[in-house]
Amino acid sequence: MAKTKSKKRKQAQAQAQSDNPRKVAKTTSPSIPTPPPDGTTTHFEPKNLHTVVSEEELEITIDTLNSLTQYPGLIKSKLCKDLRVAVYDFRQACTTGVNNAAGANLTAQVTAALADRKYTEARILLAEMKIRGEQPKLGALCRWVRDLDVISGLSTIPDQQGLVKRSEREETLIKVIDAVLRVCGHEDRNPNAIIQPSSIALQEIWDLRPDTPTEQVYASVLDGSLVASAPESLKKNIRIIETTPGPERKPPNHHDAILYASTPEAVPLSTTPPSTTHRPHPVVQGLSVATNVLYPEECKAIIAAGEYVNFVPDAPLREDGDISILAHNFYWVVDKTFHDTLWSRIQPFVPVSMNGRLARGINRRFRVYRYVPGAEYRAHIDGAWPPSGITKDDKYVYDDSPAEKKQSSLFTFLIYLNQDFEGGETTYFLPAAREGILNAYPVRPVMGGAAIFPHGEINATLHEGTGVRKGAKYVIRTEIEYDVEPTEEVKI
């Protein structure tokens, strides 16, 4: 019956095409010779799923398979013979998942299990990796965390009151990411960690804000006074140096990526540095916060620059057609004077050397973000960046490190530009004493302060930008750069 219906549908489609004189193949400039040259075969690989099957056909197929899954006895029936063959062929053709990981190493098997959403198998494989003392490479680690796409839900509980309600699948994902962190050697050694009846145990917020009135920066953005009061030197000395169309971005986006540059007159930093203090986090290894890195007026000048040129939404293209705005951004390559002044302020508080790799400076490519309620940066691990720059003819250079002395970042440098909002903590996750549980350590943003923590090859830290509940949060993401090759003898 299924074959008959399919045949009738195809015949009807063919008849409709022959009855419609407007659908005529263009032959004026064919992309391929027809017929193709002797001895050659041409294979077309569709780029879009909808060129092969319609969205409706795909939905019907998924619904049919899900329905039959509930009744395994029916799948064995004679009527399902052709379906079983088709499903087998589909599975054999699939280039992802466990089917293609047979005989591969444990890292590849975990990747395949996650692709197939076989989370129990993934946890078993991760346990084996831990027993064998194997650790995933950074690329695999970042991919696993990205694929799991864990949502903490912490922004839904104001003032740390109450527990987050999670679905069974969300609880499972947290258990898997806990296993991932344990394989990498992460653990919470805090004997006084708060225990909660939840898969994510929220710990006390680390709050270094001074006991002084908070500047209402976002209110001045909304009423237009912040940009209106910005000096003309800002408006005259900021320019676009590169635009990447949305579809060409990685991953593709609904909006273009616009890269700005500025002269030293645009956003000048004071030559008299503020009184910066630096404190390591009491629990999270490698995490520290420096306060008074920027003056409040310097923070507001950066926000004014972003608002003047307009923050651009970050909305990745999705196959399902949904639009999810992560944040609004302002990409800015700071001038050399700005870099040198800021580096002189923060350099005393970063490790001079990591395994013989010397610290060299800050990545001049600043990603300035504006977060509002509904936009949050889910749990992730930061990747490493080279130091970016600008050529003499005003061209952007992704990797501007010296050819003979390549550099790459080892620390994230997260600068907070305001604090007049609710929520919006930067939250760090560690495996708790009990397996399957994560302890969450929130850090409250301080205007003009900066969080510094490891990424890349050195003890990369799982963290999130917890959602803002009220107001708007402005923050800069950049990196601390180090030599790729060690130049000092590493003492053992």
What are these regions (language model features)?
Residues A2-A450, G456-I492:
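Fe(II)/2-oxoglutarate oxygenase catalytic core
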